[in-house]
Amino acid sequence: MDVLYSLSKTLKDARDKIVEGTLYSNVSDLIQQFNQMIVTMNGNEFQTGGIGNLPIRNWNFDFGLLGTTLLNLDANYVETARNTIDYFVDFVDNVCMDEMVRESQRNGIAPQSESLRKLSGIKFKRINFDNSSEYIENWNLQNRRQRTGFTFHKPNIFPYSASFTLNRSQPAHDNLMGTMWLNAGSEIQVAGFDYSCAINAPANTQQFEHIVQLRRVLTTATITLLPDAERFSFPRVINSADGATTWYFNPVILRPNNVEVEFLLNGQIINTYQARFGTIIARNFDTIRLSFQLMRPPNMTPAVAALFPNAQPFEHHATVGLTLRIESAVCESVLADASETMLANVTSVRQEYAIPVGPVFPPGMNWTDLITNYSPSREDNLQRVFTVASIRSMLIK
């Protein structure tokens, strides 16, 4: 894997810097490195593809070295270099695709394609070794079963979940009280509602709670907490739990009271925040517990009192909500996040070449399914294919 990264890094630098008019002295070190790559690869044969619709391709390396010059690089020099660069880039692209579409239930962190296994040989270590990529660094750690650490921005840690629970219900669905939520990606939105605006509740207050368990532990997380849930701030028609009917939800938004968010690890509270909004942090956690209250306003203008009458019908429904968004965090496991395209790269290649469903990944690389059942085998394979996707993205956009 590190050899594949070093190949890609050398080719990217060569493609960017070996251009007509450049002083040879400015790129002499790069050309020496480029020539070392050619010397190492010459005389070797590789085969890629042969799975799904990914075609079989044979690769043979027999290239001349780039020479020295005292002057600027001319058009002939650059054209010779470009022909070599283009062949190598095409090779790296096909090795990456061949690796991204393969999976294994055992030792999925190790190279799975014949071409990448061959590149792992000791003779190829002479290619400019470069371990500067976070993905390569963590791949090496995971390969040795040592602790890894990925930094993610808006990590897709929450499987998609959208539903509701009713704490008070009746067949007519005209005086409901309960909680509804939407968990997806890096965000939780939860709303508590009471059609009667807590008119008969103790102290005219309804208590709500929402607990979310993560599939992986996050550490050093920066989090935004807001006293609102905008996705539940407009009228909607909702299917009943049994699917027999529908009910109408017409929210009027109040500010939540006594808001508390707890971050837990293995059942132990690590961080707690009360009535604190904006940016907060959490050291390490695998569970988030949100609790908040809907309190009937003790004093209301006539216009507000008209919204919340003391008896039915309740045409407007008192609602309070919270939004919790994980902006950045560190995780030992690889995840999809907002700043990278690794999941899209892997999925698109597998779809384009009609790769059959294997023993590890779900059909279509469905992320909700994948993260919901994030087994060690999936973790190993996902880290490997994401590492390869990061290498491919250096050359192929």
From Swiss-Prot:
Superkingdom of origin organism: Viruses
Keywords per UniProt: Calcium, Capsid protein, Intermediate capsid protein, Metal-binding, Ubl conjugation, Virion, Zinc
Short name of any one Pfam family annotated for the protein: Rota_Capsid_VP6
GO CC annotations, alphabetized: viral envelope; viral intermediate capsid
Signal peptide coordinates: none
Membrane-spanning ranges: none
Binding-site residues for Ca(2+), renumbered to this chain: 266, 286
Residues where Zn(2+) binds: 153
Cell compartment(s), UniProt: Virion
Coiled-coil annotated residue ranges, if any: none
Post-translational modification: The N-terminus is blocked. Sumoylated with SUMO1 and SUMO2. Sumoylation of viral proteins seems to have a positive role on viral replication.
Predominant cellular place of this UniProt entry's protein: virion
Entry's Gene Ontology molecular function annotations: host cell surface receptor binding; metal ion binding; structural molecule activity
Biological processes annotated in GO: fusion of virus membrane with host plasma membrane
Keyword field contains Metal-binding: yes
Family, similarity comment: Belongs to the rotavirus VP6 family.
Function, in words: Intermediate capsid protein that self assembles to form an icosahedral capsid with a T=13 symmetry, which consists of 230 trimers of VP6, with channels at each of its five-fold vertices. This capsid constitutes the middle concentric layer of the viral mature particle. The innermost VP2 capsid and the intermediate VP6 capsid remain intact following cell entry to protect the dsRNA from degradation and to prevent unfavorable antiviral responses in the host cell during all the replication cycle of the virus.
Subunit structure of this chain's protein: Homotrimer. Interacts with the inner capsid protein VP2. Interacts with the outer capsid glycoprotein VP7. Interacts with the outer capsid protein VP5*.
Miscellaneous comment as given in the Swiss-Prot or TrEMBL entry: The VP6 trimer contains a zinc ion located at the center of the molecule. The zinc ion is not essential for either trimerization or transcription activity of the DLP. Zinc-depleted VP6 has an increased sensitivity to proteases.
Name used for this protein in its record: Intermediate capsid protein VP6
Organism: Rotavirus A (isolate RVA/Sheep/China/lp14/1981/G10P[15]) (RV-A)
